[in-house]
Amino acid sequence: STALGVASTCVQHLALVARDHQTVGPVSLFVLSVLRSGERKSTIFRKMSEGIWEMQRELKEQWDHYQEEKQGKLTHLFERDIPPKILFEDATVQGLAKEIETGIRSVLMSSSEGGTVFGGIGMRGEALMGALAFLNKAWDAEAQSMTRKQAVSTYLEFYRLSCLISSQRETIQEWLSKNAGLAEGMGFLARFLICVPESTIGYRIYKQAPDATTKLDRFTEQCLKRLRQKRY
């Protein structure tokens, strides 16, 4: 599931998928993995997302170079006060929308600890309905505008958002119990591919690390190659 979420992020700015000539949509994915603590969620994501992190480092270097030189062809990415990002782990909906509008238009919202997402990003209280509405539209790459009191208006179009969340069952159950069925009623959970694998805690036998990770290296190489095809 982690590989699928990362892969969708790396190609979502390049293609659409068509079930028929009238039903065309993005290849972005919303993925939710329900796992116990200790299942190596963070380690797996770190390994699988190396291509995304490398692309962010490249963007940071380009941004740094632009800030030093302040010359050459101007682009909206490097005129910003902060480097552009692809990966977001802790952001409000308003902050995420503004980042997409002014920076990279193909991004990943991810967390190996579901509490970061379900406990943040405006997913509680009065902000919850607005957050779910935003994410529901983003799943289908639907154009949307956001206007909030004491906040700058944001308009999103031609963007892509994938979500890759790993969480403990207790975190999700607590969040669902507090939002009075709003997430289910608005179809938020229906947009996710939900994975609940069997626990391997207590059954994992130690194996010496391999000298080479050829398949993982090829995956990372392909991810980075696609991310460099800039069509944001």
Question: Where do the PLM segments sit?
Answer:
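Phosphate-handling catalytic cores of nucleic-acid transaction enzymes
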Residues: 1-232
